[in-house]
A protein has these predicted regions:
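Conserved PLP cofactor-binding pocket of PLP-dependent enzymes
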Residues: 164-185
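Conserved active-site and cofactor/substrate-binding residues in soluble primary-metabolism enzymes
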Residues: 28-35, 106-110, 142, 154, ...
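Aromatic-enriched alpha-helical interface/lid elements that frame and gate functional surfaces
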Residues: 90-166, 170
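Alpha-helical scaffold segments in soluble metabolic enzymes
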Residues: 33-40, 68, 114-118, 146, ...
Length: 242
């Protein structure tokens, strides 16, 4: 993450670089490795030839760094840590509520007007400091303070219902407890429950993406001991005696 640049742009600007929160380099490398395998299989099917797939952790991180390198190469602009905001794009931030945090993306002019209506402050959208996309970007911190003062008076549920009614892109910042309680997660089977021999029922994320004809599934828990699945693989998958 550090070598690939991600750690350097993650966190608050006045603090040391922060971890993303998960071991994302490992997951990205596995994802690009899988993509490489699929592309190599397609090549093999066309040509009959195999090839070596070289996947580096840092290059997998580098691949998702958007225009980070190109920005610096072309103009000398070095992207830095900005915390939760998008610099000069406002409002687009996480705001405090009575009982949690809420993400609001109201930076486009029509959306910002609807946000002001939801706040019952329609004149705010006509204020020269906030009336245009560029003006809001120049007064980002001040505008965030105004919105945060308003969101603090509401619960997450109240704010969610209000902004949904005004068609303002927004959403609650979820944790695992929220995910397990959300009917959308259940309806799409985004999480599934498996019986673990040691832990009992364990709920976890399902397999993604979803396929209409050949849906994937989590069939069993991870092996507890080395070689636990050897017999099954040899006999059932390879047709060889264990």
């Amino acid at each position: 993450e550090g070598f690939g640049g991600l750690r350097g742009i993650t966190g608050e600007p006045d603090r040391m670089p922060s971890r993303v929160g998960i071991s994302i380099g490992d997951s990205l490398a596995a994802t690009y490795g899988c993509m490489g395998i699929l592309a190599a299989l397609h090549h093999r099917n066309q040509t009959g030839e195999g090839q070596i797939i070289d996947v580096a952790l840092y290059e997998s991180v580098l691949q998702v760094m958007e225009s980070y390198v190109a920005d610096y190469s072309a103009s000398g602009f070095m992207r830095t840590r900005t915390g939760a905001i998008l610099p000069k794009i406002a409002p687009s931030n996480v705001y405090p509520c009575k009982d949690g945090e809420f993400l609001i993306g109201g930076n486009q002019d029509p959306i910002f007007k609807r946000l002001c209506d939801a706040m019952e402050r329609p004149k705010l959208a006509q204020d020269p400091r906030y009336a245009t996309h560029l003006a809001r970007g120049e007064n980002q911190a001040e505008l965030d303070d105004i919105i945060a003062e308003w969101t603090r008076t509401l619960t997450v549920a109240e704010l969610e219902a209000l902004l949904l009614a005004h068609a303002v892109p927004s959403g609650k910042v979820y944790d695992a407890e929220d995910m397990l309680a959300d009917p959308h997660y259940a309806a799409r089977e985004s999480v599934v429950t498996l019986d673990d021999p040691d832990l009992g029922p364990v709920t976890m994320q399902n397999t993604f993406p979803k396929f209409s004809a050949t849906p994937g599934s989590i069939r069993k828990h991870a092996p507890r001991t080395v070689g636990e699945d050897t017999t099954d693989i040899l006999e059932r998958w390879l047709g060889r005696p264990a």
